[in-house]
């Protein structure tokens, strides 16, 4: 039995969840998210202020996995429209700077030109102290992808530790050549 999948998702007071066939729409104070679940192995229903995800066939192993996945995605949608999500990144290196230009993010990370990252719909960048970047949004997956895109501009290198890293991320350091 899927332990996560059998738990109901509680719907807070200010959040409205509606299910039409395979389309789940979650509206809340921060915005609206819609996701399509094309899996015929699970059903989604709203009952008594809770979202229930049920399997169509109890013996199916794939259905157990999809039940847990679907429940987790719906829980993230509810969390996103109530509180939102954020990922923090920090820049380590001499002369590494970040600036906000309108909605977009401009990074100076040792290249001959500044790198501009355009904010997608639903994503907001904040810059603190020129070297800390905060990526905010209501869609957990989209926030994670944008943070990964920012990090990919200059990944942390193992010799000096320079680059863009997630806050609290530990970079394994290597010894340089001796001799």
Swiss-Prot record:
Organism field: Halothermothrix orenii (strain H 168 / OCM 544 / DSM 9562)
Top-level division of the source organism's lineage: Bacteria
Transmembrane parts of this sequence: none
Coiled-coil boundaries: none
Description of how the protein assembles with itself and partners: Part of the 50S ribosomal subunit.
Gene Ontology terms: cellular component: cytosolic large ribosomal subunit
Protein name: Large ribosomal subunit protein uL6
Record-linked PROSITE patterns: RIBOSOMAL_L6_1
Gene this protein is translated from: rplF
GO BP, sorted A to Z: cytoplasmic translation
Keywords tagged on the record: Ribonucleoprotein, Ribosomal protein, RNA-binding, rRNA-binding
NCBIfam families listed in its UniProt record: L6_bact (TIGR03654)
Function recorded in the entry: This protein binds to the 23S rRNA, and is important in its secondary structure. It is located near the subunit interface in the base of the L7/L12 stalk, and near the tRNA binding site of the peptidyltransferase center.
The keyword Ribonucleoprotein appears for this protein: yes
Family matches, as InterPro entries: Ribosomal_uL6-like, Ribosomal_uL6-like_a/b-dom_sf, Ribosomal_uL6_a/b-dom, Ribosomal_uL6_bac-type, Ribosomal_uL6_CS
Family: Belongs to the universal ribosomal protein uL6 family.
Pfam families referenced in this protein's UniProt entry, alphabetically: Ribosomal_L6 (PF00347)
SUPFAM superfamilies with a match to the protein in the record: Ribosomal protein L6
